[in-house]
């Protein structure tokens, strides 16, 4: 089964089973809503424990969660420094707006110019604030391609292919 990180359990909080989460998702409200089911992975463990969110609140830069049936610090302590993940099935497209994609859909795509020349493969995405920048590993060097309308002309996630307009100085 393919898993995707949505948060890291950095510590416990209090004695009533709250855990302190550092979010790694763009969809915090949806992922950490009361009643949602997540997979909790203990540190250095490959086997998940299914958890259901019982309560959620913000505290400083963290999200504090409690899980159903785990209302004691002793029950959540083993998950400290672990990860919270969702399955690919839980990554629904209704969270995305038009021309938005999940990172896992873009990473691994082959980038080609409008003329058909292969530029490389997307191996990372940098979030710069203004727009995302794709790190494309070419045969000789890495290229940084901004995800903007003037450059990215077509994205086919099924075929894992992206067509870009190569502006002067881009590569």
From Swiss-Prot:
Listed GO MF terms: ribosome binding
Domain named PRC barrel: residues: 98-170
Subcellular location: Cytoplasm
Matches recorded under InterPro entries: PRC-brl_dom (IPR027275), PRC_barrel-like_sf (IPR011033), RimM (IPR011961), RimM_N (IPR002676), RimM_N_sf (IPR036976), Transl_B-barrel_sf (IPR009000)
Pfam families, per database record: PRC (PF05239), RimM (PF01782)
GO biological process: ribosomal small subunit biogenesis; rRNA processing
GO cellular component, as recorded: cytoplasm; ribosome
Superkingdom classification of source: Bacteria
UniProt keyword terms in alphabetical order: Chaperone, Cytoplasm, Ribosome biogenesis, rRNA processing
Chief location bin: cytoplasm
UniProt record similarity statement: Belongs to the RimM family.
Physiological role: An accessory protein needed during the final step in the assembly of 30S ribosomal subunit, possibly for assembly of the head region. Essential for efficient processing of 16S rRNA. May be needed both before and after RbfA during the maturation of 16S rRNA. It has affinity for free ribosomal 30S subunits but not for 70S ribosomes.
NCBIfam families referenced in this protein's UniProt entry, alphabetically: 16S_RimM
Subunit structure: Binds ribosomal protein uS19.
Protein name: Ribosome maturation factor RimM
